[in-house]
């Protein structure tokens, strides 16, 4: 086998079945319209760029059993994730406006689902809409843990922005711990339940067994993404990328660094499969019913495995990782400034105000 034409085409053997919702094409126009309606897409150029990222396809791969409005919700969340993430990619570092919006989002996660506050701006209003829709039909326990994962994500973006300016000597392991907060997989795992109409029993979700599987799945996604985005992030002078960290730490050439990341993925896949094969023992030890065990199995298949496999299949096709999509490091990573027009003035309101 010859070398891939680009890092984006690097092969990973993901031993999980390929799956995708049949409703991807049907929900795509509505999802793009939602992004425009909420001010997340402000120009035709941005719309063309996002269209090339194939985010509705990503949702279809992440949530293969989702249909109709459930898949639309998943697609809208994908649009939010990527457009919000890019707001932190600024040549001047972490912007005060991004911090202000993040604080407002963090405040909302502590409140019951409801309409966005007046004058919230596009990012906050869009997330409030997503959160309202996400909570529909879900238990209070799910809402509590889903809000917690969103908080970790919002805080993680701030931490990553600070680390981006100084993380050059840290190990790949340190980097992975930080990136696990911002890659967005843990809110997605929760959304897998919401869009596919089930909930994993709390007692097994919080077991070391399932938490270890979640951590492994997240690290696999991070590492695969880092390989695919190597050229794009190198061109922007990015430091938070496993391949680029290995090049600096070990003075490795690009090829050997990519090969090492491939081995890291293989090791994590092997560990994941060992845990998956022992899941029934954990269910038995927790004295779960047959119906509860079925939900655990579904979580493993249509949340963890579908995210790992779906991410890999998508990243090989998405323009998100192409060199053509990259902007010079002297420019922001976004086309539309969504937080500079946020309308947020001062700190978020205190509880009860």
From Swiss-Prot:
Query: Looking at the keywords, is Lyase present?
Result: yes
Residues at the site labelled Plays a critical role for substrate recognition: 86, 160
Keyword Metal-binding annotated: yes
User: Pfam families this protein is in?
Assistant: Terpene_syn_C_2
Q: How is the cofactor bound?
A: Binds 3 Mg(2+) ions per subunit.
Reaction(s) catalysed (UniProt annotation):
(2E,6E)-farnesyl diphosphate = (-)-(E)-beta-caryophyllene + diphosphate
Which residues does the annotation say bind Mg(2+) 1? 85, 89
Q: Which GO terms describe its molecular function?
A: (-)-E-beta-caryophyllene synthase activity; metal ion binding
Residues that, per the record, bind substrate: 179, 232, 320-321
Gene Ontology BP terms:
terpenoid biosynthetic process
Query: Which residues are involved in binding Mg(2+) 3?
Result: 225, 229, 233
The UniProt annotation puts motif DDXXD motif at: 85-89
Q: In which pathway does it act?
A: Secondary metabolite biosynthesis; terpenoid biosynthesis
Q: Which keywords does this Swiss-Prot/TrEMBL entry list?
A: Lyase, Magnesium, Metal-binding
Q: Where is this site: Plays a critical role in the stabilization of intermediate cation?
A: 82
Q: Which cofactor does it need?
A: Mg(2+)
State the EC number(s): 4.2.3.57
Q: Could you give the domain comment from the record? A: The Asp-Asp-Xaa-Xaa-Asp (DDXXD) motif is important for the catalytic activity, presumably through binding to Mg(2+).
What family is this? Belongs to the terpene synthase family.
Function, as annotated, reads: Catalyzes the conversion of (2E,6E)-farnesyl diphosphate (FPP) to yield the bicyclic sesquiterpene (2S,10R)-(-)-(E)-beta-caryophyllene via a probable 1,10-cyclization, which could involve the abstraction of the pyrophosphate from FPP to yield a (E,E)-germacradienyl cation.
Name of the molecule in the record: (-)-beta-caryophyllene synthase ((2E,6E)-farnesyl diphosphate cyclizing)
The source organism is Saccharothrix espanaensis (strain ATCC 51144 / DSM 44229 / JCM 9112 / NBRC 15066 / NRRL 15764)
């Amino acid at each position: 086998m010859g070398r891939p034409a680009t890092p984006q085409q690097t092969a990973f053997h993901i031993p999980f079945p390929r799956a995708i919702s049949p409703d991807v094409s049907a929900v795509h126009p509505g999802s793009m319209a939602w992004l425009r309606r909420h001010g997340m897409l402000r120009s035709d150029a941005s719309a063309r760029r996002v269209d090339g990222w194939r985010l509705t396809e990503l949702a279809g791969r992440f949530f293969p059993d989702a249909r109709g409005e459930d898949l639309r919700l998943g697609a809208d969340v994908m649009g939010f994730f990527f457009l919000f993430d890019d707001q932190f990619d600024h040549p001047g570092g972490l912007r005060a406006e991004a911090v202000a919006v993040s604080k407002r989002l963090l405040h909302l996660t502590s409140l019951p689902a409801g309409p966005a506050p007046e004058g919230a701006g596009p990012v906050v209003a869009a997330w409030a809409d997503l959160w309202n829709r996400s909570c529909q039909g879900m238990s209070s326990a799910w809402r509590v843990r889903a809000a917690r994962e969103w908080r970790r994500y919002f805080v993680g973006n701030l931490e990553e922005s600070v680390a981006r300016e100084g993380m050059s000597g840290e190990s790949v392991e340190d980097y992975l711990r930080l990136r696990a907060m911002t890659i967005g997989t843990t809110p997605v795992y929760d959304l897998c339940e919401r869009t596919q109409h089930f909930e994993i029993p709390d007692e097994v979700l919080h077991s070391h067994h399932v938490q270890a599987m979640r951590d492994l799945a997240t690290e696999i996604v991070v590492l695969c993404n880092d390989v695919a985005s190597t050229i794009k992030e190198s061109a922007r002078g990015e430091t938070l990328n496993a391949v680029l960290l290995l090049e600096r730490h070990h003075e490795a050439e690009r090829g050997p660094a990519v090969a090492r990341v491939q081995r890291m993925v293989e090791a994590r896949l092997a560990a994941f499969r060992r845990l998956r094969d022992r899941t029934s023992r954990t269910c038995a030890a927790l004295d779960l019913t047959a119906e509860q065990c079925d939900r655990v199995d579904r979580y493993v298949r249509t949340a963890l495995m579908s995210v790992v496999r779906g991410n890999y299949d998508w990243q090989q096709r998405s323009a998100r990782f192409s060199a053509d999509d990259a902007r010079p490091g002297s420019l922001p990573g976004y086309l539309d400034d969504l937080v500079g027009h946020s309308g947020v003035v001062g700190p978020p309101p205190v509880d009860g105000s």
